[in-house]
Amino acid sequence: MDKKASGISGENALFGDVPNDVVGTTYEMGLDGIFDDGETDVIESPADAEEHVTTDIVADEGDNLITKVDDMIGYLKRECQDHGIAVRKEWVNVLTRKFHMSKKIYASHLDFFLLGVMGERHVAVEKDFKDTAVRLSDEVNKMSGISKKVADNETRMIKELDAKMKEMGSLIGKFNGVLNEFKGSMAVSSRPASVASWALDQTTETSREKNYNEFLKKLGFQDHHIKSPLMKKCTVMITDEMYDEVMLENTSEDTLGIYKEQIITYGQSIQKKVEKPIKKDPYADF
């Protein structure tokens, strides 16, 4: 069988059940409908459409329908309480006005209203949080600057205090040196002239000779200087304050140097007096 014969046979098989007396209808595009067959269709109004709603559908929609203002306010308060939100009077006024305008309101309307309120609250909280974070950052920067200034001032004050303390220590050392020199000169001038008193002083000095040796060592004198007769004469200028201060190691290196210089100066003055030339007696030969 050729292809043409096969095609005709397939077409007859496809439309074999269609009756031969079917008459086609002509449709024309009109302004009042998408497909207009010449007849006028009646379009139902919304009111007519509502009349055709069955009782079962109204019952289903009435499950969430709020018909009283008090019920609406009660529902709003319960939902707000569940979400931890305080009801505002302005919200009640807005919803009441909306209820009276539409004569009906659904619970879903209130849910969307609360979603809007919560969204606005979240945005406000986020903005406040950002503003607070910015203010805290500014305050932290200010406090950091203040802390740095305080630290710098503290360091400067410590340095100034150290300098003042060193200056005061130096002045105190000089003052002690002058005071000890004065006390030494007073001790020399007030030395007893009687033989008995002199012998008593010599006995006392001899008993403390070992301690004086230690005292002189702390000042930096060598052993041969300490044991010299001239040094023994210099011990009279050593005051109790000088002795205790040096032996207890309560003095500075500068003060030790001052004490040593005073003893050397005193020894030199004694040596000059001893070496002073004696005038020859013109009558010695007679």
From Swiss-Prot:
KW Phosphoprotein (keyword) present: yes
Function: Non catalytic polymerase cofactor and regulatory protein that plays a role in viral transcription and replication. Stabilizes the RNA polymerase L to the N-RNA template and binds the soluble protein N, preventing it from encapsidating non-genomic RNA.
Signal peptide: none
Protein origin, superkingdom: Viruses
Species of provenance: Northern cereal mosaic virus
This protein's GO CC annotations: host cell cytoplasm; virion component
Alphabetized UniProt keyword annotations: Chaperone, Host cytoplasm, Phosphoprotein, Viral RNA replication, Virion
Quaternary structure annotation from Swiss-Prot or TrEMBL: Homotrimer when phosphorylated. This trimer is stabilized by binding to the L protein. Binds soluble protein N, and ribonucleocapsid.
Protein location: Virion; Host cytoplasm
Protein name: Phosphoprotein
Post-translational modification: Phosphorylated by host kinases.
Chief site of localization: virion
